[in-house]
């Protein structure tokens, strides 16, 4: 029998009533047995008993239709129009396919989301894992820039996302075997993601909710004997 624990504290602060400064503190000690689980980021995180800042970003409105994001510890998928019925924690783990274009690592990032009352939306954001030492969007940046176009109603959603990664180092995270093979390249990839979901009019009936997705990702300069392209669904 192996045991462990996790502790999470979510802090939300508003200065105007329309903005929000979000900080997530997290601690835990669970050992290596949790590191390979697909639900690792939902159930626990191994901080060796230290209470640390796990997430931190600021959200504020720009006019009536734009929401802006900026933070020292943020991920791409927090700045999208939600492309799945799954909640954000599960979205990161499942991603509707291995090595999805929605994967990212927590670091410095910023972006915006434009939403109309009719359901149309556009979102674009970038996260840079190397910004602390080399600044944002430079030649040596370890970054992922995603742009999404979406249409959402009360019961269904469709979206398409372009993901451009530079020197990316997380190709193998939660990936299929083929997707993990792309880690041998220089990290530059171009990917496309399609998402859709549908919910029945009445909740709790025998009619299921449906959420589907398809991703394709191609290495810009694949290494020898490394995967050039990976698909997932």
Where is each model-derived feature located?
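Charged, low-complexity surface patches
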Residues: 47, 138-139
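Extracytoplasmic/secreted cell-surface and envelope-processing proteins
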Residues: 33, 78-80, 132-134, 168-171, ...
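Detector for outer-membrane/organellar transmembrane beta-barrel domains
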Residues: 118-119, 140, 148-233
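Generic recognition of flexible, low-complexity loop/linker segments
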Residues: 8-11, 109-111, 135, 145-148, ...
């Amino acid at each position: 029998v192996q045991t462990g624990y996790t502790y999470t504290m979510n802090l939300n602060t508003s200065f105007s009533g329309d903005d929000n400064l979000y900080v997530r503190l997290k601690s835990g000690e669970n050992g290596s047995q949790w590191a390979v689980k697909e639900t690792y980021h939902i159930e626990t995180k191994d901080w060796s008993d230290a209470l640390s800042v796990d997430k931190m970003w600021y959200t504020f409105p720009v006019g009536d239709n734009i929401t802006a994001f900026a933070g020292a510890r943020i991920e791409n998928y927090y700045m999208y129009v939600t492309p799945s019925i799954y909640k954000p924690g599960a979205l990161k783990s499942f991603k509707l396919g291995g090595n999805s274009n929605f994967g990212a690592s927590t670091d410095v990032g910023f972006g915006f989301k434009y939403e109309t009352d009719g359901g149309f939306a556009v979102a674009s954001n970038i996260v840079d894992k190397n910004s602390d030492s080399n600044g944002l969007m430079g030649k040596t940046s370890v970054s992922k820039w995603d742009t999404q176009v979406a249409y959402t109603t009360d019961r269904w959603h469709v979206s398409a996302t372009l993901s451009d990664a530079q020197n990316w180092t997380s190709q193998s995270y939660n990936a299929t075997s083929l997707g993990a093979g792309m880690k041998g390249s220089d990290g530059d990839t171009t990917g496309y993601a399609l998402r859709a979901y549908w919910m029945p009019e009445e909740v709790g009936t025998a009619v299921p909710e449906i959420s589907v997705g398809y991703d394709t990702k191609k290495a810009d300069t694949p290494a020898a004997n490394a995967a050039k392209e990976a698909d997932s669904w």
